[in-house]
């Protein structure tokens, strides 16, 4: 991420590029793009104008819904037309840009483990899917440990999603449940371990050897 930020000018630009590359068929308002990238609205709008100018994205009209809660009354629903943005598949450098942006290490693996460790006693962390450029994988992250705080992991994952530009598919399991599922050849576990994946942390294997 740091190298790409230097090449492309800012972390926000890289996050927004990934956001559109990972979601090529969706249309987003500048407000939603800013929210998902955890970026300032003004900065986001500036980047979107640059993207449009070079032909990376194109405008599309969308209907935006706003819900306003009112005391002792039904919520007020407002719908308005606004400008949305979507990836322009005719962008001439789409493939090489995608290879560069997506195939570059998304988040340092040691940093990922360090962040997730805030949630409790980690035993196993497996990366698949988006982290190893395997789009067909069932999961992106399998997190195993003892007394894990799911709310903490949820916050960490949300932060990673904003950096990567894609919603992550992940599962959290207590060690005992993981061992049981593995012993009965559970489909979820096999869908991860029988296909390309990368172990970022494996204390379970270390414990076997001791």
Question: Model-found features: residue ranges?
Answer:
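Regulatory nucleotide-sensing modules
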Residues: 125-129
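Short, solvent-exposed beta-strand edge segments and adjacent coil->beta transition regions
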Residues: 138-140
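Short hydrophobic/aromatic beta-strand micro-patches
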Residues: 142-144
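Catalytic core of pol beta-like nucleotidyltransferases
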Residues: 2-121, 131-136, 146-210
């Amino acid at each position: 991420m740091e190298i790409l930020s230097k090449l492309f000018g800012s972390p926000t630009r890289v996050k927004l590029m990934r956001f559109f590359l990972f979601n090529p068929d969706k249309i987003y308002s500048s407000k939603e793009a800013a929210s998902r990238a955890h970026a300032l609205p003004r900065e986001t709008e500036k980047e979107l104008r640059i993207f449009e100018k070079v032909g990376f994205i194109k405008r599309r009209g969308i209907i935006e819904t706003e819900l306003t809660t009112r005391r002792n009354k039904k919520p007020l629903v407002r719908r308005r037309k606004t400008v949305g943005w979507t990836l322009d598949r005719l962008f001439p450098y789409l493939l090489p840009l995608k290879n560069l942006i997506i195939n570059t290490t998304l988040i340092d693996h040691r940093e990922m483990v360090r962040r997730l460790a805030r949630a409790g006693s980690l035993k196993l962390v497996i990366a698949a899917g988006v982290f190893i450029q395997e789009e067909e994988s069932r999961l992106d992250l399998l997190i195993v440990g003892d007394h894990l705080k799911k709310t903490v992991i949820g916050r960490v994952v949300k932060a990673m999603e904003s950096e990567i530009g894609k919603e992550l598919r992940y599962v959290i399991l207590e060690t005992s449940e993981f061992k049981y599922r593995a012993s009965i050849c559970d489909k979820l576990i096999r869908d991860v371990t029988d296909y390309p994946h990368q172990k970022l942390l494996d204390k379970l294997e270390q414990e076997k050897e001791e």
